[in-house]
């Protein structure tokens, strides 16, 4: 056959085949069955560009033939030509053919260490191992120029940022870009530059065909685009020196590739670009090895890296070089180089090595000396000592706490709500203690605060409110009494004792139990005075002494004198027995009996723990006169447990007089309290659980100013002291906490200097009154033979440096008239216990100070009071002995709790003891009689041994019994008695707001019903955010509770990518649940919190900047560039011709370029004098920011990859926040909006301060650096682009789009614009909110303005990242930047009710304001005060418009007028119809005319009602100078300025803002007459989140909504000490902890932005909106919301488990043909079609869309009535006009049948209203005389026939009147909608 005939036949065959293909159905399934089943084909090959049919064949085999093939032992192979060429042609991999070395060769070859191959940055696919190198020349491969196919494929894939195999050549560019026109334009532009010209419509042509079209004219050379991209790849990702020429030479020498194939390899490298610059040339070669292998695979060639021929090639594993020969070869070169170096040195007159050698020797000698000294020091002092003495003191880290005035109000409020919520039901000791602390902080502001809350306590709500009112009033009265008194330390705690038990299972259990015999400290003092059996001493009586004297004298006396002596002796005895002044044992007993009668503990009846004794609070301020002091009850010959000793020649001995002084002081302190006002005290050793901590509590509760030291300075420690001060700090008290190591001499000196230095020098300027140095460390286990480094260090702390401390204070004391009292911590342990190192020696040595006080010169500046501290349970030193304390007390001595010992020591600070200390040193024995126990060590050892022995026996018996029971009764015998822990399961609810019952709603605001126009009320129906704490739910958990719940932890773990949901086979078994994202191992949901919480907290919130989140930005190495001038010619480098010419263009004569002939590349040499920009790095001091949680990924939510790669990161935050906000509104499909509103009525008013900063960075910085940047980067930088993406991917609306830019106030400004957009009628649904990102550029510029927190300084001050944002505190120092987005869905209340979406809050008011003239853009201003603008003048009475009853009366009058107008208009329609008939002639349709006109009348009536409600409800206050916008907005909901419960502050933590904002809110409240004593809660969210700029107001608004929903007010947990300057703002409370209230009615949100932007929004609880509704409307709404909640709940769970929360729309809800018709019909609505909401032809310009059902029914009735001219009645009633809850009204006007019918309808309110309207219409149709407006209409009954049609039945008077008027029958028509009911009646005569 001739070729031309063959070609013609082939053409015909192809045409026919194609025709058949297009015209016939595809029967591929049948075809597969033929070759798979009939022919049992085992090898199937697809010839085509991609494995399309092969994939289908694989699926078919798996689904249908798997078992079939197994039965027949068929092993099928499905291949595709495009990817399986080697398998098809049976070509082995070249690597498999590489020669393998034999073991013998390996042994004979000298082994060398294997060099670790550096791994290059990850490319798109795994890099295959290169073929082993060969010594011979590589076999060259026939060259082939680049094909257009590959070039186009690479250029498109590179632009799409996808690997080649992800870009099918069968698709057109238009399909590949997925609708992104800018990317499409970029690709076409690149192709144009590459090929010179493009065919027509290349975007619609598949890449295969496009390549064929280009191939005809393609030269095979790389063009401009590809050359530029390759050049950029080499310069940005290859190591220095590895140029294009190097790469080409390597490819040629390594694989024998020619220039064309080299081009192809370089092209393929573009789609496998490394993530980072490769580190070395070896890495680069490895990279190109992999690319070359890929190219070879795609090109169908084999690569070999060794010689293709030659006998030696196969066996050559690499040449072996003789090392000796190599050394000889290089020796001469090294020698020459050395000689040259020496010549140069001589020329420079510099001797090599001499200087460095001398210095080296000196350094070595010095180093040896130093090392010797260090070794000696280490050997002598030990490692522990060396580390222990390191100084830690820093004045910068000091914490000052003095804001008692704020904590007092916080505590009062907490107590108030504790009573209300039943947490506090009786007055116990703790409550009394709280009351004392509150009284200690009483001031006029606090009293007003308490009085307001007690006066407004709603007792009708229950018993707890009554209790709160009663107790609260008592506390107020107490506070008034002590207002002028000094604060006192008064401990009312229960006295406890030790109790040790051994359980049946052998467990030793210790607890502190209340003592029944001693209930309060007054009785405790009495007990201490009595002493015990062990403290009794046998002392001779006076009589016995006289007898001994008499006997001694009488022996030496004469008989006469003996008689005289006997008479004198007898007289003396009589005097002793009769004298009341001489103490005897009997007299002591008598006194004791008298004293114990009224105070016997068993007879005490006024124990404040009893519930009935709440009057204990009332008696707290009373001062008790002590008639009989406790000292008078000290028994004879008994030493009290607590006593004072006096120094005698025999040592220290008990002194009764001094002890009485001390005990009486203790008694007074217990009964009346002890004040420390104006006392300055230093306390060391006051850690948690120590005696010092209890002493510290007492000092600050008594009003002292205390500086306390801590050796373990941390956030946890400072929080401990802050909490202590917040609870116990009294008026005038101050607590200062500093880090301090008492083992460091430097710290001792620095501490004292800090205390005494003047404030201007950075000190306190104090003069100490007392020093309580209790610092110590335990030395347990150190005996005489083990006095180690720790013992020596402990000795230094407890003795050496304690003395230094006293000495330093002495040297700083300014005068001799104010000595500081030092309470020395002595111990009875003088080696008694043993094995405690140098503890005893340290304590004994302190006693030398009693003598030195006399012998040295510091007695006038320091006084000494030794306190021998007894056995104190629970301290760090003694806690191990707790279990034997009970046994010790049974010996007749006393052990003490920490509170008791602190009380004892504080008793040494009474004025009497202080005075005594100034006269002489005082020794206070607080040992509890322990010193009277001989062999204490033996007793303690025996007690411990007995306990352990008992425990062992019981344990053994328990185990034996258990074994016996199991043998007898089986292993499960204990099952019923075993303790089972019920572990909680996660329950992720995604709840909507809880709806109250209608009756509860009506109680809130009964007058509100029907008062507001709901189309002019804007509500928040959805809200969400993306921020440092995840989303709004997880942020609220952290803000409100300070920790994540189990559900919150799961959600955060999911957000951060720690876990994912798995549903399918796992490890060979079906599994449905959470798995660890890294290991793919299952994890139980209850374990998620414990496993991931630490990591979650570490990588969320405010934290150190994580470079991986910000493209590698590390503030510690912030990169900048600096211009330098080149001082000498630089080394040449290689680049492309285009780049070389650009260098030449820039540098001119200072740049040389030359072409490299081999490669066509150019070398460039920068010459002297050229200017270059050289990067440098500085240490930036803003290291901390609020960052999105690490691991946050838009893919987790379902956002497509192409969108992620296209948009700015902030757009992703906005998309996620938007979809979550919609879900929060119950909207699972945004197109649902269009069922209720037109596409033009959904708008977007969200905005940003900066917009896409990542895009801006790319546009300016990266583009300037010539880094790869997408060509459409500009569009992503626009602030409105984020809103555009929301519309393009989710909404497809055509409504208003407004983009506010208000810096930090953007979000609230957005809400303001959104509300205006809705109220102006331009939209009914609007997305509002704000968003901003964090980037280094903004961070740097904020720092330049000194606006942000300096992290370096904060670290110096001991702050952790999470506490660096501290609004309102004394130490606040700049805001903390953050990033994220916040979105709210707002709409009209009317629409929200119709849709049944949740209403989270009502937006009662928004406003923005500028400030005054100035020159500072960021300066804070008070312009927003204008929301409280209101003229007062000398006006005395409020405007009546503020009275809702007045407004309601006016509204009702107006509604009556509208009703009358509507009825009149409807009755005139007949006349209008007659006139219209004449006008339109034959074309006139009576029915159509009446229908349209009726609808117009209805719409006009509705508009008038709306205007009336706006006038008297929504907008009555506007433009009224007497009513402030803020007051008016609240009054619209029947609220007052007192009802704003919370003010959410902008609170940036800057010095200026927090003061300015507090002043603004305070003045706002004051001007509007807020009640005194009623401050708003101040919420300062930014302590937790940082400041996200544009998103700030959105997050605050979300928090405000959550406050309304929960009633919980979150505290500012970083408010460790509120600034004293803020105390003046009495209308603001600054809580530091969350407070659960009984409900918040309204919340104010204020926001301030740079550029004179002030903004405020007020949200009101939705209950006040629901109060506007009637019962049926509310209950119908509740039903809708419940159904929507269930649907959303299901959707959210599916979204999280399937990662499908975000589902991008791919089509608008209308076809292209319907786009414009939809825009042009405002009544067009979507319908559900195949489970999708879409517009259709029938919904556009529909005849049914304008005229409503009511109008049609009414028109029909009117057209019927047109035949008669009399007996017509028309009545119109608003649904809200009929009160169906009024039983009297129903009984008087409706029959039983009517009531039953109406109540059983779907809408009872409408049914009753329609029936009433029908009665009125019938009455009018009868034409009889009215009996007045109040006449009953029960005689007119409206019934329904079998078809439901209304019928009229007349009874009684109505029937008589009808008969009299000649009416035979009355026809009635009723219709209603959700607004009104209309009835038309016609009488038949």
Curated annotation (Swiss-Prot):
Acetyl-CoA binds at residues 1771-1773, 1797, 1807, 1816-1826, 1840-1843, 1870-1872. SUPFAM superfamilies: 4'-phosphopantetheinyl transferase, FabD/lysophospholipase-like, NAD(P)-binding Rossmann-fold domains, Thiolase-like. This is Fatty acid synthase subunit alpha. Residues 92-107 have a biased composition (Basic and acidic residues). [Alpha(6)beta(6)] hexamers of two multifunctional subunits (alpha and beta). The gene is FAS2. Residues 146-221 form the Carrier domain. Fatty acid synthetase catalyzes the formation of long-chain fatty acids from acetyl-CoA, malonyl-CoA and NADPH. The alpha subunit contains domains for: acyl carrier protein, 3-oxoacyl-[acyl-carrier-protein] reductase, and 3-oxoacyl-[acyl-carrier-protein] synthase. GO terms for biological process: mitotic nuclear membrane biogenesis; palmitic acid biosynthetic process. GO terms for molecular function: 3-oxoacyl-[acyl-carrier-protein] reductase (NADPH) activity; 3-oxoacyl-[acyl-carrier-protein] synthase activity; fatty acid synthase activity; fatty-acyl-CoA synthase activity; holo-[acyl-carrier-protein] synthase activity; magnesium ion binding. Keywords: Fatty acid biosynthesis, Fatty acid metabolism, Lipid biosynthesis, Lipid metabolism, Magnesium, Metal-binding, Multifunctional enzyme, NAD, NADP, Oxidoreductase, Phosphopantetheine, Phosphoprotein, Transferase. The modification O-(pantetheine 4'-phosphoryl)serine is found at residue 181. Gene3D superfamilies: 3.30.70.2490, 3.40.47.10, 3.90.25.70, 4'-phosphopantetheinyl transferase domain, 6.10.140.1410, 6.10.250.1930, NAD(P)-binding Rossmann-like Domain. Its EC number is 2.3.1.86, 1.1.1.100, 2.3.1.41. It comes from Candida albicans (Yeast). Transmembrane segments: none annotated.
């Amino acid at each position: 056959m001739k070729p031309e005939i063959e070609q013609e036949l082939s053409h015909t065959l192809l045409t026919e085949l194609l025709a058949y293909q297009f015209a016939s159905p595809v029967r591929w399934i049948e075809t597969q069955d033929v070759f798979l089943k009939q022919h049992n084909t085992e090898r199937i090959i697809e010839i085509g560009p991609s494995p399309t049919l092969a994939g289908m064949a694989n699926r078919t085999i798996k689904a249908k033939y798997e078992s079939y093939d197994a039965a027949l032992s068929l092993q099928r192979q499905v291949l595709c030509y495009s990817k399986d060429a080697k398998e098809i042609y049976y070509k082995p991999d070249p690597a498999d053919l590489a020669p393998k070395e034999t073991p013998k060769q390996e042994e004979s070859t000298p082994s060398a260490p294997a060099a670790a191959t550096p791994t290059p940055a990850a490319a798109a696919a795994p890099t295959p191992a290169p073929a082993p190198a060969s010594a011979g020349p590589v076999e060259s491969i026939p060259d082939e120029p680049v094909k257009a196919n590959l070039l186009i494929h690479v250029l498109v894939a590179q632009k799409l940022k996808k690997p080649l195999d992800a870009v099918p050549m069968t698709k057109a560019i238009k399909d590949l870009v997925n609708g992104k026109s800018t990317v499409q334009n970029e690709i076409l532009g690149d192709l144009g530059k590459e090929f010179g010209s493009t065919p027509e419509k290349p975007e619609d042509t598949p890449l295969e065909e496009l390549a064929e079209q280009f191939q005809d004219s393609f030269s095979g050379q790389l063009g401009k685009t590809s050359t530029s991209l390759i050049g950029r790849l080499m310069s940005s990702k290859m190591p220095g020196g590895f140029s294009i020429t190097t790469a080409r030479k390597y490819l040629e020498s390594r694989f024998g590739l020619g220039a064309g194939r080299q081009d192809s390899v370089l092209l393929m490298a573009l789609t496998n670009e490394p993530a980072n610059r490769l580190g070395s040339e070896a890495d680069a070669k490895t990279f190109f090895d992999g690319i070359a292998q890929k190219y070879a695979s795609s090109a169908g060639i084999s690569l070999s890296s060794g010689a293709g021929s030659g006998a030696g090639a196969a066996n050559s594993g690499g040449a072996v070089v003789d090392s000796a020969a190599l050394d000889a070869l290089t020796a001469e070169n090294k020698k020459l180089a050395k000689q040259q170096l020496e010549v140069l040195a001589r020329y420079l007159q510099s001797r090599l090595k001499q200087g460095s050698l001398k210095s080296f020797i000196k350094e070595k000698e010095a180093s040896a000396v130093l090392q010797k000294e260090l070794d000696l020091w280490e050997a002598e002092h030990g490692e522990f000592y060396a580390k222990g003495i390191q100084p830690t003191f820093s004045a910068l880290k000091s914490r000052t706490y003095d804001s008692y005035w704020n904590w007092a109000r916080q505590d009062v409020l907490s107590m108030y709500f504790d009573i209300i919520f039943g947490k506090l039901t009786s007055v116990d000791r703790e409550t009394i203690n709280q009351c004392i602390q509150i009284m200690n902080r009483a001031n006029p502001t606090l009293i007003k605060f308490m009085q307001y809350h007690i006066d407004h306590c709603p007792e009708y709500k229950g018993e707890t409110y009554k209790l709160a009112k009663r107790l609260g009033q008592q506390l107020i009265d107490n506070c008034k009494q002590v207002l002028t008194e000094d604060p006192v330390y008064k401990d009312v705690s229960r006295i406890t004792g030790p109790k040790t038990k051994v359980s049946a299972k052998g467990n030793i259990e210790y607890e502190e139990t209340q003592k029944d015999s001693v209930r309060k400290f007054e009785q405790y003092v009495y007990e201490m005075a009595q002493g015990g059996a062990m403290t009794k001493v046998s002392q001779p009586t006076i009589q016995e002494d006289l007898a001994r004297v008499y006997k001694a004298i009488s022996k030496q006396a004469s008989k006469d004198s003996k008689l005289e002596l006997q008479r004198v002796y007898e007289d003396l005895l009589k005097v002793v027995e009769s004298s009341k002044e001489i103490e005897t044992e009997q007299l002591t007993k008598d006194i004791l009996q008298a004293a114990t009668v009224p105070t016997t503990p068993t007879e005490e009846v006024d124990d404040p723990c009893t519930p009935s004794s709440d009057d204990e609070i009332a008696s707290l301020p009373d001062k008790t006169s002590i008639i009989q002091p406790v000292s008078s009850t000290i028994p004879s010959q008994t030493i009290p447990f607590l006593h004072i000793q006096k120094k005698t020649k025999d040592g220290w001995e008990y002194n009764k007089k001094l002890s009485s002084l001390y005990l009486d002081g203790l008694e007074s302190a217990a009964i009346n309290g002890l004040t420390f006002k104006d006392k300055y005290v230093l306390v060391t050793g006051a850690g948690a659980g120590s005696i010092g901590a209890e002493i510290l509590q007492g000092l600050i509760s008594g009003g002292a100013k205390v500086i306390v030291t801590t050796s373990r300075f941390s956030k946890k420690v400072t929080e401990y002291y802050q909490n202590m001060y917040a609870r116990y700090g009294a008026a005038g008290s101050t607590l200062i906490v500093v880090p301090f190591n008492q083992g460091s001499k430097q710290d001792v000196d620095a501490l004292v200097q800090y205390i005494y230095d003047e404030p201007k020098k950075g000190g306190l300027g104090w003069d100490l009154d007392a020093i309580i140095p209790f610092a110590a460390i335990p030395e347990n286990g150190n005996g005489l033979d083990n006095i180690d480094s720790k013992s020596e260090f402990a000795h230094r702390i407890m003795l050496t440096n304690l003395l230094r401390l006293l000495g330093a204070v002495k040297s700083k004391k300014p005068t001799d008239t104010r000595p500081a009292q030092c309470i020395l911590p002595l111990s009875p342990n003088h080696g008694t216990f043993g094995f405690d190192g140098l503890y005893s020696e340290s304590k004994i040595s302190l006693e030398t100070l009693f003598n030195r006080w006399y012998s040295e010169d510091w007695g006038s500046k320091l006084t000494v009071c030794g306190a021998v501290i007894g056995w104190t349970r629970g301290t760090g030193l003694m806690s191990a002995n707790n279990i034997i304390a009970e046994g010790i007390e049974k010996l007749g001595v006393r052990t003490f709790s920490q509170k008791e010992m602190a009380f004892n020591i504080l008793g040494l600070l009474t004025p009497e003891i202080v005075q005594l200390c100034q006269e002489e040193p005082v020794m206070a024995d607080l040992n509890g009689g322990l010193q009277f126990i001989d062999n204490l060590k033996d007793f303690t050892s025996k007690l411990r041994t007995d306990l352990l022995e008992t425990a062992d026996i019981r344990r053994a018996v328990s185990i034996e019994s258990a074994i016996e029971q199991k043998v007898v009764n089986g292993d499960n015998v204990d099952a019923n008695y075993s303790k089972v822990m019920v572990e909680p399961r996660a329950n992720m609810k995604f709840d909507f707001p809880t709806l109250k019952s209608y009756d509860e709603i009506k109680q809130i605001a009964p007058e509100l019903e029907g008062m507001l126009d709901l189309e002019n009320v804007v509500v928040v129906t959805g809200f969400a955010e993306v921020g440092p704490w995840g989303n709004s739910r997880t942020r609220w958990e952290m803000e409100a509770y300070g920790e994540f719940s189990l559900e919150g932890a799961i959600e955060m773990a999911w957000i951060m990518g720690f876990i994912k949901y798995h549903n399918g086979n796992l490890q060979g078994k079906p599994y449905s649940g959470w798995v660890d994202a890294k290991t793919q191992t299952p994890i139980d949901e209850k374990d998620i919190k414990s496993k991931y919480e630490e990591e979650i907290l570490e990588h969320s919130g405010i934290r150190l900047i994580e470079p991986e989140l910000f493209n590698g930005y590390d503030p510690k190495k912030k990169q900048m560039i600096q211009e330098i001038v080149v001082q000498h010619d630089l080394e040449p480098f290689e680049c492309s011709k285009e780049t070389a010419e650009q260098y030449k263009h820039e540098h001119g004569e200072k740049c040389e370029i030359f072409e490299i002939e081999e490669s066509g590349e150019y070398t460039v040499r920068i010459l002297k004098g050229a200017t270059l920009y050289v990067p440098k790095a500085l240490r930036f001091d803003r290291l901390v920011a609020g960052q999105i949680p690490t691991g946050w990924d838009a893919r987790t939510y379902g956002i497509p990859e192409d969108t992620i790669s296209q948009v700015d990161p902030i757009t992703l935050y906005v998309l996620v926040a938007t979809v979550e906000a919609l879900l929060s509104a119950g909207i699972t499909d945004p197109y649902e909006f269009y069922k209720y509103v037109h596409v033009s009525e959904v708008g977007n008013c969200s905005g940003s301060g900066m917009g896409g900063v990542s895009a801006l960075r790319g546009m300016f910085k990266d583009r300037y650096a010539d880094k790869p940047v997408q060509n459409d980067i500009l569009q992503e930088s626009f602030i409105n682009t984020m809103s555009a993406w929301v519309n393009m991917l989710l909404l497809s609306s055509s409504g208003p789009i407004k983009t506010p830019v208000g810096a930090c106030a953007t979000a609230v400004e957005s809400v303001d614009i959104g509300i205006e957009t809705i109220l102006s009628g331009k939209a009914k649904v609007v997305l509002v909110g704000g968003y901003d990102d964090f980037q280094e550029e903004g961070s740097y510029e904020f720092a330049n303005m000194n606006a942000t927190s300096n992290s370096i300084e904060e670290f110096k001050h001991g702050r952790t990242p999470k506490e660096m944002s501290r609004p309102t505190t004394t130490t606040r120092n700049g805001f903390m930047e953050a990033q994220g987005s916040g979105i709210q869905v707002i709409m009209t209340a009317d629409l929200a009710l119709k849709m049944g979406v949740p209403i989270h809050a009502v937006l009662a008011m928004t406003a923005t304001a500028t400030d005054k003239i100035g020159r500072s853009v960021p300066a804070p201003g008070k312009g927003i005060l204008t929301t409280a603008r209101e003229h007062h003048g000398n006006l005395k009475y409020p405007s009546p418009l503020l009275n809702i009853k007045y407004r309601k009366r006016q509204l009702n009058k107006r509604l009556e007028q509208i009703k009358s107008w509507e009825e009149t208009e409807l009755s005139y329609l007949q006349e209008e119809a007659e006139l219209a008939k004449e006008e339109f002639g034959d074309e006139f349709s009576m029915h159509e005319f009446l229908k349209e006109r009726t609808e117009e009348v209805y719409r006009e009536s509705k508009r008038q009602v709306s205007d009336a409600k706006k006038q008297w409800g929504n907008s009555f206050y506007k433009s009224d100078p007497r009513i402030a916008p803020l007051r008016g907005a609240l009054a619209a909901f029947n609220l007052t300025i007192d009802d704003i419960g919370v003010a959410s502050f902008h609170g940036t933590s800057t010095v200026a803002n927090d003061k300015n904002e507090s002043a603004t809110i305070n003045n706002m409240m004051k001007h509007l007459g807020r009640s005194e004593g009623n401050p708003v809660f101040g919420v300062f969210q930014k302590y937790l989140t940082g400041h996200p700029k544009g998103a700030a107001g959105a997050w605050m608004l979300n928090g405000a909504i959550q406050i309304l929903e929960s009633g919980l007010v979150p505290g500012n947990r970083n408010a460790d000490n509120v600034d004293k300057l803020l105390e003046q703002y009495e209308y603001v409370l600054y809580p530091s902890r969350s407070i659960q209230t009984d409900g918040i009615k309204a919340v104010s949100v204020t926001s301030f932005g740079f550029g004179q932007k002030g903004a405020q929004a007020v949200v009101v609880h939705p209950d006040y909106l629901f109060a506007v509704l009637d019962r049926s409307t509310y209950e119908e709404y509740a039903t809708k919301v419940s159904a929507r909640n269930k649907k959303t709940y299901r959707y959210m769970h599916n979204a999280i488990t399937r990662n499908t929360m975000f589902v991008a729309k791919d089509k608008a809800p209308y076809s292209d043909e319907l786009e414009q018709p939809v825009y042009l019909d405002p009544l067009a609505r979507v319908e559900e079609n195949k489970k999708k909401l879409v517009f259709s032809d029938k919904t556009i310009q529909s005849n049914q869309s304008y005229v409503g059902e009511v109008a049609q029914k009414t028109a029909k009735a009117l057209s019927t009535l047109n035949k008669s001219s009399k007996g017509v009645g028309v009545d119109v009633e608003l649904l809200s006009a009929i009160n169906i809850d009024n039983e009297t009204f129903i009984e008087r006007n409706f029959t039983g049948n009517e009531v039953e019918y109406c109540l059983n309808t779907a809408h009872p309110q409408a049914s009753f209203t329609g029936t009433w309207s029908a009665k009125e219409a019938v009455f009018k149709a009868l034409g009889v005389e009215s009996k007045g407006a109040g006449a009953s209409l029960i005689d007119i009954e409206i019934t329904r026939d079998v078809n439901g049609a209304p019928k009229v039945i007349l009874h009684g008077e109505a029937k008589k009147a009808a008969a009299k008027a000649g009416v035979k029958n009355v026809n009635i028509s009723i219709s209603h909608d959700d607004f009104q009911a209309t009835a038309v009646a016609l009488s038949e005569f």
